[in-house]
Amino acid sequence: MYKKSTLAVLIALLTGAASAHAQTDLSTIEARLVALEKRLQEAENRAQTAENRAESAEKKVQQLTTQQQKNQDTTQEVVQRTAKLEKKADEKSGFEFHGYARSGVIMNDSAASTKSGAYMTPAGETGGAIGRLGNQADTYVEMNLEHKQTLDNGATTRFKVMVADGQTNYNDWTASTSDLNVRQAFVELGNQPAFEGPFKGSTLWAGKRFDRDNFDIHWIDSDVVFLAGTGGGIYDVRWNDSIRSNFSLYGRNFGDIADSSNSVQNYIVSMNNFIGPVQVMVSGMRAKDNDERQDTNGNPVKGDAANTGTHALLGLHNDTFYGLREGTSKTALLYGHGLGAEVKGIGSDGALRSGANTWRFASYGTTPLSKNWFIAPAILAQSSKDRYAEGDSYQWATLNMRLIQEINQNFALAYEGSYQYMDLKPEGYNDRHAVNGSFYKLTFAPTFKVGSIGDFFSRPEIRLYTSWMDWSKKLNNYASDDALGSSGFKSGGEWSFGMQMETWF
């Protein structure tokens, strides 16, 4: 009996212990689950926080990227605006450098010095030039510095200074014989907005200058008309679309400017009109007491010198070869009286008589003859009477022709023929004698260029040349101090050889 009770008690105890142990395990599991859930929630919270931070960081990065792009765009805009402003500034203001130069060496057929120059004949004293090709031994340089600007209101300004020098010495150091000189220094004011009507678009100027509308025959080194000095004026007063006028006042000095007592000045008033291709120019001048002018020793210079003068020019500027074919041509007829009888250099000769009269005719043209041949004929003729002495007469005419034969794009053969006839009767003025006769010159010049071979106005050029010239024997007797008839340079034929460069830009 006892054994059965004991067994029952043991079974009951074991059963209770197992139940208690089971309850304990469930509680632990539940606690662990709660803790795990809590940790999961905390992890989710941390993940959400990290995600929020990541999104915030991404937004900041995006904002920074956007701002950086904006900054780059702004920088690019600034760069572009700056470039535009700099370009605009460059277009509105700037310096320019231009120039002309020629330099060469010449000798005769004995390898000795010889005479040369476009004005070497007796007619040259009154402007009778001959062909210059193979006939110049000087070094002449012009250097032009300009500053131009355009203001915001559309007005323009221009300052120009020209320095020039002429030299016949072949040495590299020639300061002691230099003719270095400031030939131009002037200012122009253009397109002034306050100007209206005919003056709209005109240009005011003042200073020392060559007149803008001078023109020349380059191949004989002669201006057709040359107005220069110190003064002021206005260009391009437009009356309508085809008519414009220039008005100017120039001053010049006569005599030795080193003489402080020399106060004779020539004042030139000029009106230059352009009607389409036609030019009509009229000038008047006055030099008070020119007939009483004295030299540095106090002696009268010329008691019959003129005090006043007039000058006129009628010109035609064509963009064809005399209306016949392609090319260019210019023609002019000039007349001068008194001080105006120096018709080329207006107002530059103070020795002219009050009764002096001069007529001049000038014409030249350029045209291609074929693909490889080009021609430039020119004529210059003048008749002047009562010029320096009563009853005197200076008549001459020059015919010149230059041909270019293109060999290739960098090499050409140039040919020039020049003929001049003169009949000079100076009536003893300046110990000159009456002569008449002819002068001839032929030149052959192989020429190197970088391009535009057939363009007569394209430079630079380097030339080799040989020239032959001859003249009537009577011309040797014109004067004792001129070229023709001088020692070793008399009629009968003269050869010369040399080389020369010429450039302009």
Segments predicted by a language model, with ranges:
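C-terminal structured domain segments
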Residues: 434-486
